């Protein structure tokens, strides 16, 4: 009975495979939104202000960072929790593939979240005159929380690795 239970539990990791595949659909959605933003801005590129162009650029960078985060979670999560990716010797292999353990992945995700939060904060500062001070304070507190959390996770990971 125990052996059957353990085999079933081990096989249940494959439930995550379609979830990781589903993230690729989110990636397609981000790609569509990215190019929608570009096609929206191109016809009016000579009419918009520099500040508006910077805001659009920050939005595009934000989408790109989220896309990179999705790719990292998809591949690393699949490799760490489901099965090793067998992309073949003749195709390009990402240099970090197979090297990110769950601790490294958490640190990279935390760093990405801080970067994404920084971009949102920069967009808010570019429009500071139209945003209430209370909202700005909350945005700053949330960002500082992300930064401190990322720092703490990195420090704990470093301490854990030093103890091995």
UniProtKB/Swiss-Prot annotation:
Keyword hit for ATP-binding: no
Keyword vocabulary terms for this entry: Cell membrane, Membrane, Transmembrane, Transmembrane helix
Compartments reported by the entry: Cell membrane
Listed InterPro entries: UPF0114, UPF0114_bac
A single Gene Ontology CC term: plasma membrane
Residue ranges that the Swiss-Prot or TrEMBL entry lists as coiled coil: none
Transmembrane segments: 15-35, 53-73, 108-128, 136-156
Topology of the protein relative to the lipid bilayer: Multi-pass membrane protein
Family as reported in the entry's similarity comment: Belongs to the UPF0114 family.
HAMAP family attached to this UniProt entry: UPF0114 (MF_00143)
Protein name: UPF0114 protein Shew185_3725
């Amino acid at each position: 009975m125990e052996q059957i239970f353990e085999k079933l539990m081990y096989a249940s990791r494959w439930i995550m495979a379609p979830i990781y595949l589903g993230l690729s659909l989110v990636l397609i959605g981000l790609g569509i939104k990215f190019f929608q933003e570009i096609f929206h801005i191109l016809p009016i590129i000579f009419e918009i202000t520099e500040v508006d162009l910077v805001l659009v650029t920050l939005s595009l960078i934000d989408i790109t960072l989220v896309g990179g985060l999705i790719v990292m979670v998809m591949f690393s999560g699949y490799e760490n929790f489901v099965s090793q990716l067998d992309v073949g010797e003749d195709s390009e292999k990402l240099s970090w593939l197979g090297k990110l353990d769950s601790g490294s992945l958490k640190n990279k995700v935390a760093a990405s979240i801080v970067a994404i939060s920084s971009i949102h904060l920069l967009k808010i500062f570019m429009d500071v005159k139209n945003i209430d001070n209370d909202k700005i304070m909350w945005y700053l507190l949330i960002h500082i929380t992300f930064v401190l959390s990322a720092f703490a996770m990195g420090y704990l990971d470093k301490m854990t690795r030093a103890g091995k």
